[in-house]
A protein has these predicted regions:
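Short amphipathic recognition helices of helix-turn-helix/homeodomain-type DNA-binding modules
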Residues: 1-4, 17-18, 30-88
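DNA-recognition alpha helix
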Residues: 13-28
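Extended charged low-complexity segments that act as oligomerization/scaffolding linkers
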Residues: 81-87, 366-396
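Alpha-helical and coiled-coil interaction segments, frequently adjacent to or embedded
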Residues: 81-294, 299-319, 452-482
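Conserved Nudix-box catalytic region and its N-terminal flanking loop in Nudix hydrolases
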Residues: 298-364
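Short acidic alpha-helical/loop segments enriched in Asp/Glu that coordinate divalent cations
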Residues: 358-372, 418-422
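Active-site-adjacent beta-strand/loop module that shapes the phosphate/pyrophosphate-binding cleft
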Residues: 383-419
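NUDIX/MutT-family hydrolases
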Residues: 404-407, 418-467, 471
Length: 482
């Protein structure tokens, strides 16, 4: 792709502008940036099918001629400290080890079943825990006092770093998790689930970055209601997706047609994890999940995100509230680890990426500049009262035991329309859901009927289902209406 651009005498910005124009011609509002083009050229991220088609059209070549390849695990990657894996393994094609080929194909088949049935599996996994811990039928579970009886605004509580203690007891490398990790090309079993994902079936967006892990929840301590430790994204995936894979192995019918009743039998890794509400026992990566409400005199509406299973490792193939993203710094630089340790700033970056199509702060560049647009505009809207942000509490996805920080952002109509005048139809993680044949709209009415229909569809992510239900129960507080 670099050679094609060089031969055309174009800059990365020229290519980005060209793709955006082609998107408009197709009726799609895109926001490709030069940084995004650079990451494609370097193989850091892999463009979606739409972007591959547009790139081919822009350069006047076939998709195959673009020369794009997914990242493949190399010996250096296998032995890097980032992956915590020891030993040096020379890469071999799976065909050179028939058992590895069979193991990986079987593993892919379970992943396919998992992504098809994530919602149903989460609801069934919730039945493994006490009924008092289940958040309705959402597929979420929460400890006593983790959910707030009355939503509180983000500014009314603080977060903090837990003292550095012992390393997590469960990391996903244990023998109890071996059955969910396929054989590697050399015939040895992958040491971590994240390495198996990257080696066998890498999602388009899959990079190991710094991430904060949930350590504790205590709403009686408003200055440090939520505490975290510093870890990595892959550390969370190693446990969460291993748990999900194990559940899919034993609870999806053999023909993939349905879900079997929940049972602890064969769930050796889940038993090893133990009490899910002791998050420091394992690397518990959390996401900020935000229900975005636009409110005017006619009522309230919200938007949903159709997350592409081939693009993301977590919550793929489901309808989710937006924005949602892992709680992590924008850069590996020390300054970002201080400035970005803030839930609202995490949400702002996700708004910029998911609503406006801005390039993701991939962790390998400069820290986010919160005075620059559009981030500065979000801060001004919060300060002026054009948006109010509430926290509903914290829960866990019962399937993965991934942390979910449930929030609601309430925008007045003019503020929403100004901030999101250039809202995109698709982004790196999926597409914005639209309804209506005559005049398609992304604005879904925030009503009991809409929530019930979405829940019955079986596609609503547990965090989305739980957030919508809790927001509806607390709508008078959130909307400020009687």
């Amino acid at each position: 792709m670099y050679n094609l651009r060089d031969a055309a005498g174009e800059t990365q910005q020229d290519v980005a502008d060209g793709l955006n124009r082609l998107g408009v011609a197709r009726g799609k509002r895109l926001a490709v940036t030069a940084n995004q083009v650079s990451r494609w050229e370097r193989g850091i991220t892999y463009p979606s099918a739409l972007y591959r088609q547009l790139l081919a059209e822009h350069f006047g070549v076939s998709v195959q001629d673009l020369g794009l390849t997914r990242q493949r695990v190399t010996p250096q990657q296998r032995d890097s400290p980032e992956n915590d894996s020891g030993g040096f393994a020379i890469y071999q094609d799976p065909a050179s080890h028939p058992q590895a080929e069979d193991s990986q194909e079987e593993w892919r088949a379970v992943r396919r079943k998992l992504n098809i049935h994530r919602v149903q599996l989460a609801r069934e996994a919730a039945r493994l825990y006490d009924v008092e811990q289940r958040v309705g039928d959402s597929g979420l579970i929460a400890a006593s006092q983790w959910l707030l009886s009355t939503p509180i605004e983000l500014a009314r509580f603080g977060i903090g770093l837990a003292p550095e203690g012992t390393a997590p007891l469960v990391t996903g490398t244990e023998d109890a998790a071996a059955g969910v990790r396929p054989l590697a090309s050399d015939g040895r079993r992958h040491q971590r689930y994240s390495l198996a994902l990257r080696d066998v079936e890498q999602p388009r967006l899959f990079e190991n970055r710094l991430a904060w892990h949930l350590a504790g929840v205590d709403w009686s301590q408003p200055d440090r209601a939520l505490t975290f430790t510093t870890g990595t994204y892959f550390g969370g995936v190693d446990v969460s997706e291993a748990l999900a894979h194990e559940m899919a192995m034993y609870h999806v019918a053999g023909d993939g047609s349905g879900i079997l009743p929940a049972s602890w039998r064969n769930l050796g890794f889940r038993r090893l994890v133990g009490d899910p509400f002791t998050p420091s026992r394992r690397p518990t990566a959390p996401s900020t999940d935000t229900l975005t409400l636009r409110v005017d005199d006619d009522g309230a509406s919200f938007v949903l995100h159709n997350r592409a299973a081939g693009n993301v490792a977590v919550a793929g193939g489901m309808l989710h509230i937006m924005p949602a993203g892992v709680f992590q710094p924008s850069s590996v630089l020390p300054a970002a680890q201080v400035a970005d340790f803030d839930l609202w700033r995490n949400m702002m970056r996700e708004y910029s990426e998911e609503f406006l199509g801005s390039a993701e702060h991939g962790g390998d560049g400069e820290p986010a500049d919160y005075s620059a647009e559009p981030l500065g505009a979000f801060d001004r809207a919060l300060a002026s009262g054009g948006v109010r942000v509430f926290c509903l509490g914290v829960a866990l996805d019962a399937l993965t035991l991934w942390g979910e920080i449930l929030t609601v952002a309430v925008f007045d109509g003019p503020t929403y329309d100004h901030l999101f005048a250039d809202m995109v139809d698709s982004n790196a993680e999926g597409t914005v859901v639209k309804t209506g044949r005559v005049r398609p709209t992304s604005a879904l009415p925030f009503t009991r009927h809409t929530i019930d229909e979405l829940t019955a569809s079986g596609r609503l992510a547990p965090a989305a289902a739980g957030c919508l239900e809790l927001a509806w129960e607390n709508r008078r507080t959130i909307l400020g209406r009687s």
